[in-house]
Amino acid sequence: MKKKLSLTSKIFIAMGVGLAVGVLVRSLPEGSLKDTIIIGGVFKVLGQGFISAIKMLVVPLVFASITCGVASLSNIKSLGRIGARTLIFYLSTTAIAISISIGLAYLINPGVGLDMSSLVSEQPTIAQSSSFADVLIDMIPTNPIKAMAEGNMLQVISFSIIFGLTISILGEKVKLVKNFMENLNEIFLKMVNLVMYFAPFGVFGLIATTFATTGVEAFASLLKYMAVVLLGLLIHASVVYTGILKIFTNLSIMPFVKKFPKVGAITFSTASSGAALPVTMKTMNELGVDSKVSSFTIPLGATINMDGTAIMQGAATIFIAQLYGVDLGLGGILTVIFTATLASIGTAAVPGVGLVMLSMVLNSVGLPVEGIGLIMGVDRILDMCRTTVNTIGDCICTLIVAKKEGVLDESMYYSENDMIREELEIN
């Protein structure tokens, strides 16, 4: 039986074909065939149609997913300090992660030297410079419906968090509402899957348009973008996490490094934190963490800890801003940090959702969503790397919380025994 190509394989093929066709079309003489029928017709319909479908899902998916994510955290009230410490760690490290990627993006400037402003019908709206206080005030919606209609993502996120928190507090009284939101979220996630089915066609149209109008110069910029993301992931995993673990627990990172590869192999190959949950929790228990901590922090981290994803969003936003010649300013950068950090609460582990969340961040600062088309082809490779970093963050948080709660067996942590390997050998 002939094996079907995966969506990832189809996207890679579409990117390669789009690149080749785009370069070929660029060599054609100027005229209506090239500009109107091919670039402005076929390529535009495929590329812009896909982008419009992604835009369609941004607000409803963000509202439903974040509401469900917050509403599901009802057990934080009973867990008290564990819940508070876990949330503070996850949100703080996400903010640090995106700040690192933004700094690296401005240092390396992956999008400088390539002008893509001619590829959009409307010029991007340059984010107005705002103070820190203005950004905080702008997060509060005076009219949630208007915020959704206008695509004001910071306000949509804020309302979603408050709405989800209220559902969590009321508990059983509003169980029907919670079930309705969960069903609604499932519908929107399924819609994402349906839209992603057409991703290869969209990627072909977007990549072909890019290379037909800018040439192979775009490829060099894409490599620099990948370098920013990978360097950001490396710094966050090796410096930030190691430093935080040492500062708050005085533990050596080496026992964790020795026992994490079994988890990393799963997250890297599947690009899913959820797929590695059982092995991750077993590994934490093997490292001496009490199950009452790991059974809470690991599943919660798989839901709201998206440091690797935040690094991608920060780098991609600056990359796309540079491509279109937009200076975000301090207000725009703060908006990106706030939006990506808060959005991490509702980012689901479903292929394609990361792109929807990225389009939300781009919308929050007035950048063209069309820029996503250039990075889609390499996103799968980066996704495997950033998912692994996400899981490392879950584990480091678990170790810190367990140490602070006094439920970390340090003799087990520094032990060379590998319970999982022994268990597998017995079975």
Model-assigned labels for residue ranges:
Residues 77-85, 190-197, 286-302, 330-331, ...:
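Membrane-interface alpha-helices at helix entry/exit sites of multi-pass transporters
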Residues 257-313, 338-355, 378-401:
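Alpha-helical membrane segments and immediately flanking helix-loop junctions
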Residues 18, 59-67, 76, 101, ...:
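Alpha-helical transmembrane segments of polytopic integral membrane proteins
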Residues 6, 50, 79, 148, ...:
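Residue-level signature of catalytic and energy-coupling elements of molecular machines
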Residues 71-78, 113, 171-175, 183-186, ...:
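Juxtamembrane helix-boundary/capping and inter-helix hinge elements in multi-pass membrane proteins
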Residues 2-4, 8-12, 19-27, 31, ...:
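Signature of multi-pass transmembrane helix bundles
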Residues 34-42, 80, 216-224, 251-261, ...:
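Membrane-water interface of transmembrane alpha-helices in multipass transporters/channels
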Residues 113, 314-427:
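Transmembrane alpha-helical segments and their short flanking loops
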